[in-house]
């Protein structure tokens, strides 16, 4: 038995007849749980999930990776998780951005060398799982004893994913007890565009706009070195029909206030920024907008 609970009362989890105090006293592990979602902080959803985790895995530290991602934007959250996972403590990752909640999309748990990933099978987990070396085992979470009974099907973060993450974090259950194994190659991938080199130009797109208005692209420094561009040079950045002459520098302090710059960001990709301002507004950029970089041509022109 993995779970004892009621629709209106989470109850007390037990395992092999051990009382909670006995189990915790001898528990061999307490993995940290890294929690990411699009729940925001205006409602009780994040707090309720924390409550479930605290009841079922009271010794596990919970790290909030972020909850302010655009609602239902799987790509945005998946990229954030991929950027973050190498800096998170090994343990359990609970990720919930689930526009397909209540449909036939699978709820999954994946075991990797880093630890466990728990969430919907909609591409959210795939890049991060690949980043840490791939999954050794993946299961479809179907065991009702590992879930909170619920009158509705719209809060799987609370009822399905949080209990599974807590059981794995506390060692209360093995991944094979959550449901049947599925082939790793059956996981829904996250389709991401690749850069394309056309002569002396590298075409990519804006991947992420952070709270400061900095715009991360999917273009790596190696992409530009292949066309003879490198730090210290001035490049031409084309967004739509507008062309900008932008210095490739190391830090914001290398340009004057209000000036546009390009630099290698904290995860190793090229980003556009404005010292003391917002590059997304200055360059009219948002996630998914095409960006092309070539050698310098001229100053900003329409």
Show which residues each predicted segment covers.
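Short, Lys/Arg-enriched N-terminal segments with co-localized hydrophobic residues
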Residues: 15-28
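A conserved acidic, glycine/proline-rich C-terminal tail/linker
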Residues: 218-283
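Active-site histidine-anchored catalytic micro-motif
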Residues: 32, 56-62, 73-76, 87-159
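Anionic-ligand-binding alpha/beta catalytic cores of soluble enzymes and soluble regulatory domains
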Residues: 149-223, 227-228
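Conserved active-site and cofactor/substrate-binding residues in soluble primary-metabolism enzymes
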Residues: 44, 48, 57, 72, ...
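N-terminal glycine-rich anion-binding loop in soluble enzyme alpha/beta folds
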Residues: 30-68
